[in-house]
Regions:
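Catalytic-core regions of glycoside hydrolase
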Residues: 1-129, 174
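Catalytic domains of carbohydrate-active enzymes that cleave complex glycans
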Residues: 4-5, 10, 89, 115-176
Length: 176
């Protein structure tokens, strides 16, 4: 359900063999969904759907789709978002990234998502370091520093991060 069709209906329940698919298409990717003021409508919609059914699937977007090579420093929200969905009783997830090595840190994102979907409470920092050091070798710590600097700049800017943004959107946020 995108935007206008995302709200739970009143006076009707889905049949047991129906899955409700809720998409995070319009959400900000710079802050965790649970604590982002602009995402509270989505939080409420999940809660309202949970009153009607346990068959909820989240379709989440985790890369910059307009420009795959654009830095998209959202790695820090992946775990809290998965934890939010799990805590909300949602156990079906589709995390859409790029389908091959076209996007920024595709392999890293895939590795993190695989680990966190299996165990939402796993140590995300250890998972990231394990991948960076294993995949990039001696460059791993330098890439971790880059990732942390991008995250820090984005968080300190308090700016949004949308998956249909433009490369220049980061000029005042993560690329400062």
């Amino acid at each position: 359900a995108y935007q206008y069709s995302r709200k739970a209906p009143e006076g009707i329940k889905p049949a047991e063999n129906v899955n409700i698919v809720l998409c995070t298409i319009e959400l900000n990717r710079s802050r965790p969904i649970r604590t982002d003021p602009s995402s509270q409508g989505f939080v409420n919609d999940i809660s309202n759907w949970k009153k009607l059914t346990n068959n909820i699937l989240i379709w989440d977007y985790i890369v910059q789709f307009r420009n795959y090579l654009d830095p998209f420093p959202n790695l820090h929200v992946l775990q809290p978002n998965i934890q939010f969905f799990s805590d909300s009783g949602v156990h079906m997830m589709f995390e859409q990234g790029s389908n091959r090595s076209l996007s920024e840190f595709h392999e890293l994102r895939s590795y993190i998502m695989a680990k966190l979907l299996w165990n939402p409470d796993a140590n995300a920092d250890a998972i990231m370091n394990d991948f960076l050091n294993g995949f990039y070798g001696e460059a791993g710590p330098h890439l971790r520093k880059y990732i942390d600097q991008m995250r820090k700049a984005l968080v300190e800017s308090d700016g949004p991060l949308t998956f249909y943004g433009y490369p220049w959107d980061g000029y005042h946020t993560s690329l400062t």
